Amino acid sequence: MIEVEQLSKIYGSTPAIADVTFKVEPGEIVGFLGPNGAGKTTTMRILTGYLPATSGTARIAGYDVHENSMAVRQRIGYLPETPPLYPDMTVEGFLHFVARIKGVAAGDRAGQVNWAIKRCNLLEKRRVLIRKLSKGFRQRVGIAQAIVHDPPAIILDEPTVGLDPRQIIEVRNLIKSLAGSHTIILSTHILPEVSMTCNRVTIINRGKVVATNTPEGLMAQLTEGSGYEIEVDGDRDTAVELLRNIPGVSRIELLPVSYGAENRAGVRVISATGSEPGREIAAALVSAGVGLYEMRRTTASLEDVFLELTTTEKVETDASSEASNKPESGEG
């Protein structure tokens, strides 16, 4: 449904995105994830025809975004980060206006508007001026204008930003209800939304795609992150020294302990990839006479994956930059 191949956008000599490649299959919800400034919005604007690419191709429903821009726009619904709403129109009036400019036939407009209103749970607000709506309801109107012409592909840029927890849940459920009959790209930097909403995730950092997989697949690929949180009695240094010598232990982090537990120490043990040293950890502590109050298994989260991929990429890029700027031997 959506195919992006080696897409690049350069401003002057500065690349906003470079060789971005990914696919979204029909009916999928794909999270487009990255830190602020990673290139998410630039990619979304190219896909929706708002911005031309410097090089590369993007196709939606078989149509090239550059060569068949109008055909693409007829087949997508777009919710930018700031919804394009007219505050002095009613919800229903605004959606009729959008349906008309998006080419919905006159005889079908009322039905499409009613469908979008029902789908977005706006029945009680249909005759209310948009300026009187809460941010959560405005976001629903923004999604309604994106789907009123029933497009096969929907592109949502930060759809839950600025919403309160209840509004986030409502918008999340709405997006999930659109899956199957629509193909959705969800651009965000809010990690919980991705794991709760999306079938697959594409992570972009510094303008480049660094990973594409299911949320579960990404967590399984993490080089480290799973492990154990342990609370022990007595000398933490002794416990740490014991843990360092256990095969399969990759890293140890010190943790704060709960209030009123002055004699206890908290430790997080990060396991090496493919290792499960839990039994060895417990045996070593008990054999050494270290009091073991609690030992809890932990697993890598999408946040761990995100931090590893984006931080590693930044470190590698910075290191390369320093190397390239380093004077050659013999230079003064």
Regions found by a protein language model. Name each.
Residues 73, 117, 172, 219, ...:
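Conserved protein kinase catalytic domain
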Residues 26, 124, 234, 271-273, ...:
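Non-catalytic surface loops within mature trypsin-like serine protease
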Residues 2-4, 9-205, 210-211:
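ABC transporter nucleotide-binding domains
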